[in-house]
Amino acid sequence: MLRKLLLLLMSCIIFLTRRSKAAAAASASKTLVWGPGLETNAVLPARFFFIQTVDTTGTNFTTSPGENTFEVKITSPTEPYARIWIQILDRNDGSFLVRYRMYASYTDLHVEVLLKDKLVGKSPYVLRGAVYHESCDCPEPDGALWEKNMHCPASFSQIESDLSIFQSVDPDRNAHEIIQRFGKSHSLCHYTIKNNQVYIKTHGEHVGFRIFMDAFLLSLTRKVKLPDIEFFVNLGDWPLEKRRASQNPSPVFSWCGSNDTRDIVMPTYDLTESVLETMGRVSLDMMSVQGHTGPVWEKKINKGFWRGRDSRKERLELVKLARANTAMLDAALTNFFFFKHDESLYGPLVKHVSFFDFFKYKYQINVDGTVAAYRLPYLLAGDSVVFKHDSIYYEHFYNELQPWVHYIPFRSDLSDLLEKIQWAKDHDEEAKKIALAGQQFARTHLMGDSVFCYYHKLFQKYAELQVTKPKVRDGMELVEQPKDDLFPCYCARKKVRDEL
């Protein structure tokens, strides 16, 4: 009798297990597919869209269904061999990020998402008309329409704040005053964009970083016609304008801001280049991070983690703190440049660690370098929780971040860091919730489309403040668009304008 009951129980367990597995199977018809990479006019260096796996009951997967669950094909009816590189990144939360880089322009692209040879969602998705690749010089003449196509927000609070201190901007005055104030002791780029052509004159000795700004301006002007505008970009680490709002400050664009300066903040050169070179020269970008988040939360190492160079005293103190508290912190220096290397205090230099391997650890410690640490966007995009200290420095998105929502704050002198790490250990679910909120923030606000939107809105709003006409000044040179002789594109927009 007992044996019969056991056999009956085992049969029930097997039946329920099979039923559970059947219910958990991914559904081709219910799985969701969306994103700007399915839209013709959302032109980016690497286009992207998302897949959310949904099972047959309509429930979203929250863990990976398997790295090779989906297949994506992108074809053009007019070109049998489309030059398009596709990558499917498993985000380990039931969703996938699909990114693709086009090396030529095509007409009527067809995007098929397949699950075991079955079309997923509303596949095939058809991008009607001319679909332009990154190097195609074909700007949308209507800035408002371009913003609509890119789904840009109506405003950015940091832009509103930065420009609020300027009632007007006088390019004629700035052309003399800014050079006189900053041109000799700092490195500046003086830009004029006229008829959507980029002109530049550099000031100062170390102007190599102009390549980042040049490249982005050329990319942006290939996509949308910018208003005529004249402005200065600070190529150094530190923001420059220390005058108060009441002291008639000069408008200087910088990659980093601070509480004691009045610079106009742009997305950092690091984030900007990673957008331009996604699936290109760089391996670390806002998309690649999402596919390399390491072990799931429960299997991550319960320690704080940091690697970097000695560009701030607090970084040295962090390493000393870690050496005295090895159970809580793993922090080490990879290079000495600013301070004397005292191995008895700071330990030996260690080898560089792949950024993706950072996410083997549950707690990511973000400490300023010379200014704000430009790694923060990538740390947020992982699925570890970020610890960020109080700082006078900020990037273009910091005012949208909330402590205890998107990251765990600690004091700049590190005096409460161990206490905060212990809190995270004792409140694991709350720490995980903060990690996921930070990750969602990065996915929503720091992707390539958001970076392009930010720059365009900044230039548009700044141009509206100009009270004299931007000019191509003496000594300026044209920054020419690169030629793509191998795969030149045919711009339908230019043909329409020529016929008007």
From Swiss-Prot:
One of its GO terms (cellular component) is endoplasmic reticulum lumen. Its main location: endoplasmic reticulum. It catalyses: L-seryl-[EGF-like domain protein] + UDP-alpha-D-glucose = 3-O-(beta-D-glucosyl)-L-seryl-[EGF-like domain protein] + UDP + H(+); L-seryl-[EGF-like domain protein] + UDP-alpha-D-xylose = 3-O-(beta-D-xylosyl)-L-seryl-[EGF-like domain protein] + UDP + H(+). Glycans are attached at N60, N259. The lineage of its organism: Eukaryota, Metazoa, Chordata, Craniata, Vertebrata. Belongs to the KDELC family. Gene3D superfamilies: Immunoglobulins. Pathway: Protein modification; protein glycosylation. A motif (Prevents secretion from ER) lies at residues 497-500. It comes from the Eukaryota. This is Protein O-glucosyltransferase 2. Keywords: Endoplasmic reticulum, Glycoprotein, Glycosyltransferase, Signal, Transferase.
